[in-house]
Amino acid sequence: VGGDLIGTARWGGVYLADVLALAGVDPAAEQLVSRSADGWTCGTPVSAVLDGRPALLATHMNGEVLSSVHGFPVRMIVPGLFGFVSATKWVTDIDVTTWDAFDPYWLQRGWAREAPMLASSRIDIPRAKSRHAAGMVTLGGFAWAPRAGVGSVCAGSRTSTRTSDTPESDSIA
């Protein structure tokens, strides 16, 4: 999961929790069913949108109006959840309902209702299957732990370890 679909962006738009408050969402609601212009449906736990995270109806990405490839005119962003339950592009409407009332696209195929992202990482340097001389190899990549954050990263072998928060001269264990 992830691969080249993981990235960083600064999103701008309207807080989804504010929209739900203005709409007077029923406290019994469990699921937001968002629909996209291409017919795709997504089920998002209402609790995830109302728990304080910055869930958005995004209209901007990195200070620019959304491009069509990123979901113009509006897309849903719910940090900490995998996209199949939180990232509808080209949003046309959102229904507030229960889980029993509707099975969105991936739920119909047996996927989970809730899909929190867990701590994980990806190594981008060196590229997969590239060849290197014996000895020290520089690693580069990303680590993420939604909602908790990442304080440091430790990469090592059986003989040495280096952490991202340790000066190089002190990093070999």
Protein language model features and the residues they cover:
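Structured, non-membrane catalytic/scaffold regions adjacent to prosthetic-group chemistry
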Residues: 1-153, 173
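Ala/Thr-enriched low-complexity intrinsically disordered regions
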Residues: 138, 159-166
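Short amphipathic, helix-prone segments within low-complexity/disordered or flexible regions
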Residues: 155, 165-170
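Residues flanking N-terminal targeting/processing segments that define the start of mature chains
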Residues: 159, 171-172
